[in-house]
Amino acid sequence: MSGQQRGSVILVPEHLAGALTKLMSDFITGQDVTLSGGNIAVKIRDAINQTPGGGDVAILSSLFALWNALPTSGRQSSRDDLIPAAVQALTTAHNLCLGVIPGETSHKDTPESLLRAIVTGLQKLWVDSCGCPECLQCLKGLKAIKPGLYEIPRIIPHTKQCSPVNLLNMLVHKLVALRGHVQLAYDARVLTPDFHEIPDLDDSDAVFARTLLAALFHLNMFFILKDYITQDSMSLKQALSGHWMSATGNPLPAAPETLRDYLEAFRNSDNHFYLPTTGPLNTFQFPEELLGRVVVIDSSLCAASHVQDVITHGVGAGVPRPRFSALPPAPSREPQQTCSQLTSRGNESSRRNLGQPGGTSPAVPPVCPIVSLTASGAKQNRGGMGSLHLAKPEETSPAVSPVCPIASPAASRSKQHCGVTGSSQAAPSFSSVAPVASLSGDLEEEEEGSRESPSLPSSKKGDEEFEAWLEAQDANLEDVQREFSGLRVIGDEDEDGSEDGEFSDLDLSDSDHEGDEGGGAVGGGRSLHSLYSLSVV
């Protein structure tokens, strides 16, 4: 009987038929994902390597049997189901390019020429919009894009990631490295980059960039699907042609019947078996015919209008960028500052912003009226620091909010900020501020020290008195800063080896301390210990 009636003849001994049949069945059904048209010949050689002589004829007959079974196999049928998706991807990319770069594309363009036009358009856009080294590096990535099962390099500057690129590269990795299967789940939206996946461009350039990138991603999807659909048939034909050349020295014939008759001539009673196949012999033009079904422009499957709607009407750069509603006028507030940040420079800036007293000037930022410890007050309060009071502002005085005078050393160590608040409106009278840290001390000395603190003068006395008051605050601030600039936290070691942090003097040779006679050297570490000693939280 002819091979066309009983199937394809395989010229191997019958005792190897079981292993070889299983191998070929796994390839035809697609159950073994490690098998492909490129490595099946090697797998067959490994299965029949004990066959004496006639190795090329045995492999040739096995490849020819697979070739005839391929068109109707489940392996190829699953790939044929992806042909509409490939056609849609190509048609969408083609129509998108006709819309944004009509001068560089035409209806007769091949997918490869379409890719070159898209790459050229993106390269020009990156150079014209920015041209920085990162953009120039992405130009090399665009130039390296190849049609086929290849990952996309970095092609979009000034972005961390792009979802369509990640999707396509994951798909390539799955097909090439993991040899997985492509599921029939195709949506043009997943290949359209969002506005945050492109550089920050003008609206018109952003629409152009997103459209070109969407066309590029659809075209890459087409190349991936095209290779996935046609790769097995092309690889199998190449292997068949090579073994035919090795066996006969001639190129592959045009008709498969020639190859079938050649193999039937080697058949005898104990060196062959038949692999059942259905239908006629598979022509050697099958890969080209399959490719012709894939490289098609079908307007009925085009999704270009959908992509354009996503770009121009969806949440993206095609519409005005998301803009926040205007914030209400903020009250005159200064950011919270630490006491060490309240220097004379800040007070000078406050004086510069005073303006005219007619009420038309901006709100005056409040000054932190820190109750400073004068040289005499510091000596009197060595026994402890009492409660600190703020002057009660008069009704006509500028609005000054209560400020925590000097935070406790523990709070200062933990970077606690003084609460500085302000308002352009008249502020109510404030009562005295409770002590920040409850420290031992004579109440009479505490009250005397608080009375020594200068209060904010009334605005009725004029700007001159206010200026004088500010200068007094500057001097007081400098005294406080000199007092605190020589502090550090030390620990007295307990019996168990633990330490409780205390403040002591630092012997600094800073210019701020060279002329300070009442600094750390006067009272020594003892006075500072008794004045500021606190356990560290």
From Swiss-Prot:
Keywords: Virion, Virion tegument. It comes from the Viruses. Residues 423-441 have a biased composition (Low complexity). Residues 334-347 have a biased composition (Polar residues). Disulfide bonds: none annotated. Residues 492-517 have a biased composition (Acidic residues). Its main location: virion. It is found in: Virion tegument. Residues 321-366, 378-398, 414-466, 486-537 are annotated as: Disordered. One of its GO terms (cellular component) is viral tegument. Belongs to the lymphocryptovirus BRRF2 family. This is Tegument protein BRRF2. It comes from Epstein-Barr virus (strain B95-8) (HHV-4).
